[in-house]
Amino acid sequence: MTEQKRKIEKLTGVKGMNDILPQDAGLWEFFEATVKSLLRAYGYQNIRTPIVEHTQLFTRGIGEVTDIVEKEMYSFTDALNGENLTMRPENTAAVVRASIEHNMLYDGPKRLWYIGPMFRHERPQRGRYRQFHQVGVEALGFAGPDADAEIIMMCQRLWDDLGLTGIKLEINSLGLAEERAAHRVELIKYLEQFADVLDEDAKRRLYTNPLRVLDTKNPALQEIAQNAPKLIDFLGDESRAHFEGLQRLLLANNIPFKINPRLVRGLDYYNLTVFEWVTDKLGAQGTVAAGGRYDPLIEQLGGKPTAACGWAMGIERILELLKEDDLAPEQEGVDVYVVHQGETAREQAFIAAERLRDTGLDVIFHCSADGAPASFKSQMKRADASGAAFAVIFGEEEVANGTVGVKALRGAGGDGEKNVQQTVPVEGLTEFLINAMVASAEDGDD
């Protein structure tokens, strides 16, 4: 009796957690290089924290009645020691934890930045994923509105550096704790009048986090939210002066903004300044960067009272904007593709490829897909398809004569098939290639 060959099930990735494929990696690298250059220009230092933290960090830091903590965190119990752990849903709390644990603020304020994956258990949709990537800054130890203005200015400069347009700034002030408490009383009184028409989400938040009701996306509740008591009307002199100082600095730097009284953010640690950069090009997920001031957080997590502000931006959303506006850079090919025919030629080609890499050139050495020798024709097709600027050709005849063939490909500009193959001494190969690439680049600039 013969057994039927059992079909092996094809495995796929987790829904909402996406692979970054080679054809997209160039765009990621372009964005990362651009943002890192900007962060250096502002004196920010990189910090890297673990993906997994103690769950308590987020329940204390973000707030127990926030959507993130209540229903979006990937949390689990460590089978080894029973610790409650969570895959980070955001990184501000982790950066603050690290700054306290390692006493980073002992010698004064710090400007820190991070980049990496975050995790939230929510319904995947355009611009919203279960694993997503953020870059963010945390300015720890700065209390004035100038720090708020500077981190906002950084975002504007990044949009300019990337060539992005149509991203608009909205700002608000959440004031101080006592001002929010006074506003909360009046807000609950106001919302209670509409208890019979509030949706389930708003009813759930009414007594736990009523400020978030103002941020509702339900069309039926927009008028109620619009007419609700505004927190900005409850600000005291200190909060008002801080907010006005921020506005003056933004205007002085020609940064247009809109004051949005309903902008409250979804994390409990914010006070005073909050802001969002929004676009209408991404549908419902229009926020591409957001942040503000979180002065209470460092003390709340066990540190000394320290002012702080920062922002985070969703990398996937920004990359989508770059594609939407046709700003994605062309993927660059390598400099050289080395082809060969014959055993001796293969050995010499292998050595030459390494020597070319020693000089800083990017080189692909042709390796057979099936282990059998490939024809020059098939190798040259691969070379042209690779995007390389030049093919370096090793045959038995060339090796015997101490020469190689060099042919410009499409990656060097023009029609690769019509370019003439040249014979070059092996000893002069590197110099020839460098001169040829310089000439090709100059022709491309004309």
From Swiss-Prot:
Catalysed reactions listed for this entry: tRNA(His) + L-histidine + ATP = L-histidyl-tRNA(His) + AMP + diphosphate + H(+)
Gene3D superfamilies to which the protein is assigned, alphabetical: Anticodon-binding domain, Bira Bifunctional Protein, Domain 2
Pfam family, one: HGTP_anticodon
Coiled-coil residues: none
EC number: 6.1.1.21
GO BP annotations, alphabetical order: histidyl-tRNA aminoacylation
Family indicated by similarity: Belongs to the class-II aminoacyl-tRNA synthetase family.
Protein name: Histidine--tRNA ligase
Originating species: Burkholderia lata (strain ATCC 17760 / DSM 23089 / LMG 22485 / NCIMB 9086 / R18194 / 383)
